């Protein structure tokens, strides 16, 4: 739920959503150093996510995961010319204000970090900076958009290298959009209003989604995307682009190896329905991170359930 009931500023939201449209068809990579950021840019990433620890290391370390140190974010901003994103804890308005003051291009209100508020998400339309947020289903996606999110991503299970949850989330969103389209076609606005109540979504946003046949903002894949094949799979399901976290730099033997991996994922996203190019990308990528199977995870180890 949101901390206030203010209405999204239409003009501001249109600008923010338009900025996110410029990332379509691209790959956004998690980076922890200026050197990694430069590798990502050289590989063709459309943006980088600056954070002190990649999700797999956050999992391994445990404890409380917070916003990255501003000095580290500033170093990455100075190192590259592509957009720089950074993560804030769910509900942590002040972390978001700090990131906005830093001039980051996008703020990710992220379940990968330890939530600061177990009741409210940040009211994102009160910020000039655009936000990206995760979702597991259409209701979550539309609630975040109603709060002002200009970009949506699947939650998946970050840091695992297991794409199964990201697949589940995009399939769920797609199925519920199809359900909304059918409701609008067969029962009109009353049927859409009924579905909106059931999934906890704004009626007008759900109607717009049904009319468009997709979310009204850019929707990227994230969480467990570890290989070129994973990235292409998510594009196959209709994602507009892909976030890759631990899969690029985790276990990379050298900077050259990381660059090779990064280029392979960018190639796969750009050529997701060209299977000859995908064969090349998989060969170029080489061995993937070992990862963690979602099947063996305890409920308390899962990040995707954070947020509501």
From Swiss-Prot:
Annotated D-ribose 5-phosphate binding sites: 30, 159, 224, 245-246
Keyword Lyase: yes
Active-site feature positions: 87 (schiff-base intermediate with d-ribose 5-phosphate)
Pfam families according to UniProt: SOR_SNZ
Record bears the keyword Zinc: no
UniProt keyword list: Lyase, Pyridoxal phosphate, Schiff base
UniProt record similarity statement: Belongs to the PdxS/SNZ family.
Protein name: Probable pyridoxal 5'-phosphate synthase subunit pdx-1
Organism field: Neurospora crassa (strain ATCC 24698 / 74-OR23-1A / CBS 708.71 / DSM 1257 / FGSC 987)
């Amino acid at each position: 739920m949101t901390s206030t009931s203010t209405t999204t500023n239409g003009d501001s939201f249109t600008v923010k959503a338009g900025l996110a449209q410029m990332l379509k068809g691209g790959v956004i990579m998690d980076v922890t150093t200026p050197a990694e950021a430069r590798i990502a840019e050289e590989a063709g990433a459309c943006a980088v996510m600056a954070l002190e620890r990649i999700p797999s290391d956050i999992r391994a370390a445990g404890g409380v995961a917070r916003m990255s140190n501003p000095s580290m974010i500033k170093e990455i901003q100075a190192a590259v010319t592509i957009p720089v994103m950074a993560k804030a804890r769910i509900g942590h308005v002040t972390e978001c204000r700090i990131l906005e003051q830093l001039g980051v291009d996008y703020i990710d209100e992220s379940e990968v970090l330890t939530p600061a508020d177990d009741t409210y998400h940040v009211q994102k339309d009160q910020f000039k900076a655009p936000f990206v947020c995760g979702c597991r289903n259409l209701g979550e996606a539309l609630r975040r958009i109603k709060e002002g999110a200009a970009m949506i991503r699947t939650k998946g299970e970050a840091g695992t290298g297991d794409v199964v949850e990201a697949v589940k989330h995009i399939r769920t969103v797609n199925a519920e959009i199809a359900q909304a389209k059918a409701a609008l076609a067969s029962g009109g606005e009353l049927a859409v209003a009924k579905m909106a109540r059931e999934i906890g979504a704004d009626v007008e946003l759900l109607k717009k989604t049904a009319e468009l046949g997709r979310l009204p903002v850019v929707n990227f894949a994230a969480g467990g995307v570890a290989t070129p094949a994973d990235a292409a799979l998510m594009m196959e399901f209709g994602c507009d682009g892909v976030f890759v976290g631990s899969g690029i730099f985790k276990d990379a033997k050298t900077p050259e190896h990381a660059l090779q991996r990064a280029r392979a994922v960018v190639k796969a996203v750009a050529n997701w329905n060209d299977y000859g190019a995908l064969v090349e990308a998989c060969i170029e990528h080489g061995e993937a991170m070992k990862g963690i199977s979602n099947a063996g995870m305890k409920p308390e180890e899962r990040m995707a359930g954070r947020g509501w």
